[in-house]
Amino acid sequence: MPLLTTEELSQMSPLFRGRGGQWLAGKLMQLVRVDELNALYDRNAMHRGADFATAVLDDRQIDYLLGNAEMLDKLPQGPFITISNHPCGHIDGIMLIEIFARIRPGFKVMVNKILGRVKAMEDNFITVIPTGRKRDVPQKESLLGVKAAISQVRSGEPVGFFPSGAVSDLSLRDRCVRDREWQEALIKLIRKLHVPIIPVRFFDGNSRLYYLLGLLFGSGIRLLRLPAEVLDKREKPLRLGIGPVIDLEAQDACTDLESYAKMLRDSVYGMPLPETFLSRGELLGR
């Protein structure tokens, strides 16, 4: 079952309807390499969860290096939360699931509706539609996602969040690639859940072209580049690190939401590049 079909594109826009529209839809899917993503999915759809994540990474020869891997031996026994920056997009969630769901099979990551189409990983996904603005009314699917996250934690299972709700972009002001402001609604949810938090930082990102497209044309055009970014990550290993657990005492020391949000973001972006890493092969062989 493909992730996206030309028929579904025709439902999104009249531009892709009729014989000519379907031809155009097919060409667009080739241009942005959605057809390659469909083929990647079909080759590995017999796997589920963490096994699917592993199969996809193996298929594309995508490697990563995990810093502070010893923290995986100190994971809380009950529910916990992971928080992460989001520099690469879909591949960030896939790596998180391979790492954490192999230890805690019930681990789920809150993802957007696009990644939520990957049915082979639906057991490890909570699907939402990020609003991105404080005053936007959450859609029904997002409200269901919030309820699912609460239920996940109350049942004693871990859940992962990308608090930005969007892939990182290039900030000319800060002269670096960074997440936009983390969503207030998610910060409130994390605080309400009141369980240990594990920061995870991804130290690498997408291509220069990806960020340039975002600067010149906005997030819509940049989104079309994401399939290629997923498919072209084999050149060098991606680096990520796990930080110290943020316990309940540290969380309770924050007297307001602003200081709480700052503590969470600082726990990720303040994480230094680890001095030593464990290769993906070594991690899976543990």
Functional labels for PLM-detected ranges:
Residues 81-83, 126-127, 160-162:
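Structural motif
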Residues 2-6, 142-286:
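Non-catalytic C-terminal accessory region of glycerolipid acyltransferases
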Residues 86-90, 167-168:
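Gly/Ser/Thr-rich loops at beta-strand to alpha-helix junctions
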Residues 1-83, 93-95, 102-106, 122-123, ...:
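Membrane-anchoring hydrophobic helices of lipid-metabolizing enzymes
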Residues 101, 106-142, 146-147:
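Conserved nucleotide-cofactor-binding alpha/beta core module
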Residues 98-101, 177-179:
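Glycine-rich, phosphate-binding/catalytic loops in enzymes
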Residues 91, 95-98, 185-188:
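Short amphipathic alpha-helical face segments that pack within enzyme cores
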Residues 46, 62-63, 138-143, 179-180:
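A conditional alpha-helix N-cap/helix-loop micro-motif detector
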